[in-house]
């Protein structure tokens, strides 16, 4: 057998072997390349915007902690969590006055301060001086994030623009961002839109601020109602499970509706988005 023929036989054997391995799935370079080049989930989404209170921030324990810090040294002994719950319960009615048009827009810091006055007599703190009340109002600026937020946000920020689409005002959002090292690219939502969710302008002005169409923006929240409102306007939607966010028996472990991405927590949510 001459050398040329031997060379052809060896090459043919090598190709047959490679083909057999490829068929077995043990060696498939073209398949590996195709998998590596697979499109990421939600390729048209450029920005993630977030509900904050409850989704990103543990408002209940944070408010209770800060109120206790201020008042306990003054001799008060309240049910701190009940105080936080009562204060938060005034949140919706206060915003509804503005959403309904009965009142011009004011930012959330002002509503929180007014709502504090509404519950003072219930907890027998009517005699507190204004500087103490102002300090209590800053409890909302000193909230901590849930434990899954930091690591997951670091992953998400590698791919997406990120901002709050929150009812919180800019100063409040800036303070909690600095406290928790949140990687916001902007602070959007209520104050720039001069309204409160679920008013359509809050979602749409947030998209416009990034020069993006609604379908290029994903609203991320632990509250299905918030997501449904955004979805109706064309935003993509992501649900993050947050059972117990407002105490035992509260919060959503699962969404109440059909949304684009559903995560058990922010780690799972980042996984689903391929980051």
Question: Model segments located where?
Answer:
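N-terminal secretory signal peptides
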Residues: 1-7, 30
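Asp-based, Mg2+/Mn2+-dependent phosphohydrolase catalytic module
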Residues: 2, 10-16, 37-45, 154, ...
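N-terminal export signals
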Residues: 9-29
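Boundary at the C-terminal end of the N-terminal hydrophobic targeting segment
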Residues: 32-36
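Active-site neighborhood of HAD-like aspartate-dependent phosphohydrolases
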Residues: 38-89
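Conserved SAM-binding loop
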Residues: 56, 165, 219-220
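A metal-dependent, Asp-based hydrolase signature
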Residues: 74-75, 81-134
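Substrate-recognition element of Asp-dependent hydrolases with the DxDx(T/V) motif
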Residues: 131-179, 187-190
């Amino acid at each position: 057998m001459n050398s040329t023929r031997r060379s052809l036989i060896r090459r043919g054997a090598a190709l047959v072997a490679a083909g057999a391995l490829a068929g077995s799935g043990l060696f498939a370079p073209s398949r590996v390349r195709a998998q590596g080049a697979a499109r990421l989930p939600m390729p048209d989404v450029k920005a993630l915007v977030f509900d904050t209170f409850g989704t990103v921030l543990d408002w209940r324990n944070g408010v209770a902690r800060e109120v206790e810090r201020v008042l306990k040294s003054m001799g008060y002994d309240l049910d701190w969590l009940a105080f936080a719950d009562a204060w938060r319960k005034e949140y919706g009615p206060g915003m509804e006055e503005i959403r309904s048009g009965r009142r011009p827009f004011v930012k959330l810091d002002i509503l929180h301060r007014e709502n504090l006055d509404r519950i003072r007599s219930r907890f027998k703190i009517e005699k507190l001086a204004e500087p103490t009340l102002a300090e209590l109002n800053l409890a909302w600026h000193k909230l901590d994030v849930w434990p899954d937020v930091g690591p997951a946000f670091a992953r998400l920020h590698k791919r997406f623009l990120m901002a709050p689409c929150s009812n919180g005002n800019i100063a409040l959002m800036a303070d909690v961002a600095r406290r928790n090292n949140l990687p916001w690219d902007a602070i959007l939502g209520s104050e720039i839109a001069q309204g409160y969710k679920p008013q359509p302008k809050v979602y749409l002005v947030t998209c416009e601020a990034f020069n993006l169409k609604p379908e290029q923006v994903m609203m991320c929240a632990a509250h299905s109602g918030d997501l449904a409102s955004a979805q109706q306007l064309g935003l993509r939607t992501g649900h993050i499970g947050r059972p117990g966010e407002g105490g035992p028996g509260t919060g959503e472990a699962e969404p109440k509706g059909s949304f684009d991405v559903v995560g058990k927590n922010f780690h799972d949510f980042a996984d689903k988005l391929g980051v």
